Regions:
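Extracellular/periplasmic, surface-exposed regions of secreted and cell-surface proteins
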Residues: 1-311
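C-terminal segments of large proteins
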Residues: 311-325
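Short, intrinsically disordered, charge-balanced linker/junction segments flanking boundaries
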Residues: 325-333
Length: 333
C-alpha cells in the first residue's frame, strides 16, 4: 500500500524564480510466500499442475513451506529551489524517514541535501565568447540512508530448531533464539560531497562534464559475533564499520558528423574510484580487521575476496598457483 500527499508553491518575480514542495509518504509492504516440491513423477505431462502425483509425497519426502513478513516506511519531505536571472541556482531539501525495520531507539533518520549552480556562460563578461554555448559550475552535498533487507533484525526471533523436550510421553520440538534484539539498530548513512563542471562548445557539437566526489559511509550494517552468554544467540546485527569512496568521472559528448539526413553521436566516459575500508568495528562491537568473502567450488573451495581495514574494497585474495604436479595436484606458492 502506498500513499503520497504533496503541496507545491511557485513564485516568479522579475528575475527571481522560486518553488517549494512539502509532502508526506506512507508505504506498507507485505510479503507472503508458499512453496512445495515433489519428485519421481510417472509423467512430466502435468508439469507443476499436479504436484500430488509424485512418489516423494507418498513416501513422506516431499517438501513444503510458507512465510510472511511486513514492514512500514513513513516519510516527511520538503524541497525549496531558487534561481536568479538564469545564472545562479540553489536547491535545498530534507527528508525525515522512519522505518519499522530499525530498533525502537533509532527508527527515524534525517537526510538533508543541498546544491549550488553557477551558469558562467550567462554572465555579461562572457557575451563575446561566441564559440562557448554553456559553462556551468556545480557543487553539492547530501546524506542518504540504507535499510536492511530483513524487517525483523532488531527483534528477538525464535525458530523451531533441533532442540526437543519430553512432554506426556512425546518428544516435541522446542523454540530456539534465532537473533539477538538490538533496540539501537539504525540507518546506515552515506555523506557525499561533489563538485562538477558542465560545458558545451561549437554550437553544442562538443560537450561534456567533469565530476569529483568524496563519499563516506558510516554505521555499516553487519552481523557481529558476540559471546554467549550473556547473549542468547552468537550473532547480533548492528551498525559498525565505515567505508570511504572518492573519485572522478569524465564524460565527453561529440557530434563529429551532422547533416540533414545523418547524425553521428559519440559518447566517451572515463571514471576512477578509490575505495577504502576504514573499519569493521566500533566501540560496542568488535570484529577482525578483515573478512573473507566470495568463494570457489571444487576442487579449490576457498574464498576469493578479502575485505581488510585500510585496503580497497573488491580485492581478490587467495592462494597463488604456480602449476600442477606430476600427480595432478595444484602447486601453491
Amino acid at each position: 500500500d502506498n500513499l503520497e500527499l504533496t503541496s507545491k508553491y511557485d513564485l516568479n518575480v522579475g528575475k527571481h524564480r522560486m518553488n517549494a514542495l512539502v509532502g508526506y509518504s506512507y508505504q506498507y509492504y507485505t510479503y507472503e510466500r508458499f512453496y512445495a516440491n515433489n519428485y519421481n513423477f510417472p509423467t512430466d505431462f502435468y508439469q507443476w499442475h499436479n504436484l500430488g502425483l509424485g512418489q516423494a509425497l507418498k513416501d513422506g519426502k516431499a517438501g513444503m513451506g510458507s512465510d510472511k513478513n511486513e514492514n512500514t516506511l513513513i516519510g516527511f519531505f520538503a524541497r525549496v529551489s531558487y534561481a536568479f536571472d538564469n545564472k545562479y541556482n540553489l536547491l535545498v531539501s530534507v527528508r525525515q524517514e522512519g522505518s519499522s525495520k530499525f530498533g525502537d531507539n533509532n527508527k527515524w533518520g534525517t537526510f538533508p541535501s543541498a546544491s549550488l549552480g553557477w551558469t558562467i556562460s550567462n554572465e555579461g563578461f562572457m557575451e563575446g565568447i561566441t564559440w562557448l554555448n554553456n559553462l556551468k559550475l556545480r557543487a553539492g552535498f547530501g546524506i542518504t540512508g540504507v535499510i536492511p533487507n530483513d524487517p525483523y533484525m532488531s527483534l528477538t526471533r525464535y525458530n523451531y530448531g533441533s532442540s526437543y523436550y519430553y512432554d506426556k510421553g512425546t518428544w516435541k520440538p522446542g523454540l530456539e533464539v534465532a537473533s539477538n534484539p538490538n533496540p539501537d539498530l539504525k540507518w546506515e548513512k552515506s555523506t557525499e560531497y561533489n563538485i562538477g563542471l558542465d560545458f558545451s562548445v561549437l554550437n553544442d557539437r562538443l560537450g561534456g562534464s567533469v565530476d569529483i566526489y568524496r563519499k563516506k559511509t558510516t554505521g555499516l550494517l553487519f552481523n557481529y559475533s558476540v559471546p554467549t552468554p550473556p547473549n542468547l544467540y552468537s550473532y547480533t546485527f548492528a551498525n559498525g564499520g565505515s567505508v570511504r569512496n572518492q573519485g572522478i568521472e569524465v564524460a565527453i559528448n561529440a557530434i563529429p558528423v551532422q547533416t540533414k539526413d545523418f547524425e553521428w553521436k559519440t559518447v566517451v566516459t572515463v571514471a576512477h574510484n578509490a575505495s577504502k575500508l576504514l573499519s569493521l568495528s566500533n566501540d560496542m562491537y568488535e570484529s577482525n580487521s578483515y573478512m573473507d568473502t566470495g568463494g570457489l567450488g571444487e576442487p579449490i573451495s576457498v574464498s576469493t575476496h578479502r575485505m581488510e581495514e585500510g585496503r580497497p574494497l573488491g580485492e581478490f585474495y587467495g592462494l597463488k598457483s604456480v602449476g600442477v604436479s606430476e600427480n595432478g595436484l595444484f602447486l601453491i606458492e
